[in-house]
């Protein structure tokens, strides 16, 4: 009788590499890039606002409906700039521009988490963009 140990060992090894891939800095950069909108970032910095990038955990149904629903939830929060929410269902990430004088980033994360909990989703801040230097363009055009 065959034992499933070699398959189990292989599955465990594969899952270890998968976990490390999700936790790597490059993957975070990919998630941020998927929801980065330069026009939103420029406008936010000009208004002394910030841009928050969130990882979204949970089962997000694919499609435009999910994207629009999450964007609407994000934009309904106090302090979030209207029209600034960007969602990537494929990369499970979200960005919003917000006024830190009206809502600190940590409170924004809590409020967003509460609103998305009903959909079985949680969020975690990946990065906050708050300095014009982060938008510096280098090289010749």
Language model feature labels by segment:
Residues 1-12:
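Bacterial N-terminal signal peptides that target proteins for export
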Residues 18-20:
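N-terminal signal peptide c-region/cleavage motif recognized by signal peptidases
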Residues 43-60:
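Short glycine-/aliphatic-rich beta-strand segments at the starts of folded cytosolic domains
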Residues 89-98:
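Surface-exposed aromatic
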Residues 98-105:
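Helix N-cap motif at beta-to-alpha junctions
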């Amino acid at each position: 009788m065959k034992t499933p140990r070699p398959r189990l060992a292989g599955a465990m090894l594969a899952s270890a590499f998968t976990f490390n891939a999700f936790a790597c800095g490059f993957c975070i950069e990919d998630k941020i890039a998927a929801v980065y909108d330069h026009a939103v970032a420029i406008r936010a910095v000009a208004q002394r606002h910030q841009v928050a990038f969130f990882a979204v955990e949970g089962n997000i149904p694919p499609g435009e409906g999910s994207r629009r629903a999450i964007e609407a939830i994000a934009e309904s929060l106090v302090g979030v700039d209207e029209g600034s929410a960007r969602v990537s269902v494929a990369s499970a990430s979200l960005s919003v521009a917000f006024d830190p004088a009206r809502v600190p980033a940590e409170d924004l994360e809590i409020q967003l988490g509460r609103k998305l909990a009903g959909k079985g989703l949680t969020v975690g801040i990946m990065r906050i963009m708050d300095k014009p230097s982060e938008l510096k363009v280098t090289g010749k055009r």
